[in-house]
Amino acid sequence: MNITISLVAYAQKFTETESFESLLRMSDIIKNKLNIIVFDNGSTDYSDVALPSGFHSLTYIYNKDIVERGTRIAYETSLTHSNDEWLMLLDDDTSLTEDYLSLLLAELGSKIRDTEIVAYCAKIYDGVTQISPTASETLDMLLFPKEAGVYKQDISGISSTLTLRKAFIEDIGGFSKEFPLDYLDHWLFSQIIFNQKKVEVLNCQLNHQLSVQDLSSLSEERFYSIFSSEYRFYKAYKPELFCQLNKKYVKMVLKGFLKRDSGIRWKSLIKVMLKVKTNKPEGKRGLE
């Protein structure tokens, strides 16, 4: 069985990213089962760069859309180009391993696989902290990491290495335009749970650097994008936690205003909370 990998590149040349370099290190047996689609959101078009051989296929797509330059358009484009049953989402700063891909491919090819499982993921670490997958029914997600196993509720995580059944994504209408970049991953997990499907966490650890862990490293624009997306997500999909989120933001505003945390852009948080949303959220999508 082959799988399609949607690798989303940004500022760095795709051949020099952590994820692409890790793919190049795979054995020929693994490479020959991978259809790689590199979707480049960066400022430089590398269409003229010679593509390495060894993969079942390797396609480079430069994003010429000047408005939408995020993960959603990358995933949606990869979905339409893929002829495989499964699509892996991959950030450019996640390091894949031979062990993980071998385990994943074995699971996907198993004849006794639970057909209700529509997503697989690894345990993702940033340093010593497991950042994905985690519980979803709390704002303190990192305090409740998920172990290997099959889940049908209370689970969320990042999109990198999340491998999705193509038919499931098509059945729910594709990747939501509500979240062109941030919180699309949380939306995906929420849709799996809402549609009573399952996620399997494989017993394998991978490394990924999560930028949101260090707020001081974020630009003003990036900070606003992350927190406005979080606010919209909880308002539309987790209303039971929305009141807690507002309290959390108020505390962050006070902390930022008093300059106890230079990473908090408190004016941006106020803007997020006061912004009047004129468009109704898409809501949860049920299977046909």
Model regions and ranges:
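Short beta-strand-to-loop element that shapes/binds the nucleotide-sugar donor at the catalytic cleft/hinge
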Residues: 120-131
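Short, flexible, basic/aromatic active-site loop/helix in glycosyltransferases
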Residues: 135-155
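Non-catalytic, C-terminal membrane-associated alpha-helical segments of glycosyltransferases
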Residues: 220-230, 235, 239-288
